């Protein structure tokens, strides 16, 4: 998750964020074919299919200030799955986290 979040800033193409994630997981033998993030906020123009921008290969949409994105680092296999995510606002030199919840992992 951090590798994607740290790549977010104004002027970066959406596909570049996803590429960071892919380069992180593929050497470990994992592949994720679905997007790594999607827009959030008021409305989903042009429709609920979210055909605006996504963190996926081929999406050349340039991140602009104050865009909102739900970024998710997720892997699903036949044996297990995991997902961690963060909702953020794109800023000039990075991102602003929308939640104040710690991402600390607790093991019982």
Locations of the language-model features?
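Active-site neighborhoods and metal-handling regions in enzymes and metal-associated proteins
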Residues: 1-108
């Amino acid at each position: 998750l951090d590798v994607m979040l740290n790549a977010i800033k104004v002027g970066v193409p959406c596909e570049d964020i996803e590429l960071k994630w892919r380069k992180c997981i593929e050497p470990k033998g994992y592949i994720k074919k679905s997007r790594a993030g999607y827009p959030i906020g008021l409305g989903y123009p042009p429709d609920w299919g979210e055909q605006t921008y996504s963190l996926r290969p081929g999406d050349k949409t340039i991140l602009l200030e104050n865009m909102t994105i739900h970024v998710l680092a997720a892997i699903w296999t036949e044996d297990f799955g995991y997902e961690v995510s963060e909702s953020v606002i794109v800023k000039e030199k990075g991102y602003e986290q929308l939640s104040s919840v710690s991402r600390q992992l607790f093991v019982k």
